[in-house]
């Protein structure tokens, strides 16, 4: 499998999720399965079926995270510069509306719009990578082409 690029923050978040899932997998779900078995006939036991399904889902996620972490390449904060790279925060201005937005450019695995984390694989993320303060980018959106100017780039 090829390397998966993650910020330090994204790597630590996945490690914590893995620990939490393993704890849940080992104790909570196992206990639910045990309790459901004690109810008798497993062929019509919805609690047992639900617990087994949850066990499968959690087990799959554990394997997925372990795969990601074992192939992770951590992106450390780089030197201060005005170039947009992975892990950097960027302030952009929509030249059509005047609205400003602040995002951190992250890998697709870490993207979270509500936490201001923009995927480097998104149309806007792709167009911003490698740009510098003052550069203008054009992005195709459902509402038409949007123009953004890079106003600031920072590590934090």
From Swiss-Prot:
One of its GO terms (molecular function) is DNA binding. SUPFAM superfamilies: FKBP-like, GreA transcript cleavage protein, N-terminal domain. Keywords: Coiled coil, DNA-binding, Transcription, Transcription regulation. InterPro entries: GreA/GreB_C_sf, TF_GreA/GreB_CS, Tscrpt_elong_fac_GreA, Tscrpt_elong_fac_GreA/B, Tscrpt_elong_fac_GreA/B_C, Tscrpt_elong_fac_GreA/B_fam, Tscrpt_elong_fac_GreA/B_N, Tscrpt_elong_fac_GreA/B_N_sf. It holds the Pfam family GreA_GreB. The keyword Plastid does not apply. GO terms for biological process: DNA-templated transcription elongation; regulation of DNA-templated transcription elongation. Residues 1-32 form a coiled coil. The keyword Kinase does not apply. It comes from the Bacteria. Necessary for efficient RNA polymerase transcription elongation past template-encoded arresting sites. The arresting sites in DNA have the property of trapping a certain fraction of elongating RNA polymerases that pass through, resulting in locked ternary complexes. Cleavage of the nascent transcript by cleavage factors such as GreA or GreB allows the resumption of elongation from the new 3'terminus. GreA releases sequences of 2 to 3 nucleotides. Belongs to the GreA/GreB family. HAMAP family: GreA_GreB. This is Transcription elongation factor GreA. It comes from Thermotoga petrophila (strain ATCC BAA-488 / DSM 13995 / JCM 10881 / RKU-1).
């Amino acid at each position: 499998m090829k390397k998966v690029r993650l910020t330090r923050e994204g790597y630590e978040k996945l490690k914590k999720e893995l620990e939490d899932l393993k704890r849940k997998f080992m104790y909570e779900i196992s206990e639910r399965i045990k309790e459901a078995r004690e109810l008798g006939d497993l062929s019509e036991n919805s609690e047992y079926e639900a617990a087994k399904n949850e066990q499968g889902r959690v087990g799959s996620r554990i394997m997925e995270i372990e795969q990601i972490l074992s192939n992770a390449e951590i992106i450390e904060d780089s030197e201060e510069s005005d170039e947009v790279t992975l892990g950097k925060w960027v302030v952009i201005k929509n030249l059509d509306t005047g609205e400003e937005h602040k995002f951190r450019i992250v890998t697709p695995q870490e993207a979270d719009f509500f936490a201001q984390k923009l995927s480097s694989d998104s149309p806007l993320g792709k167009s911003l990578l490698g740009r510098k303060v003052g550069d203008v980018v054009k992005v195709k959106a459902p509402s038409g082409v949007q123009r953004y100017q890079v106003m600031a780039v920072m590590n934090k």
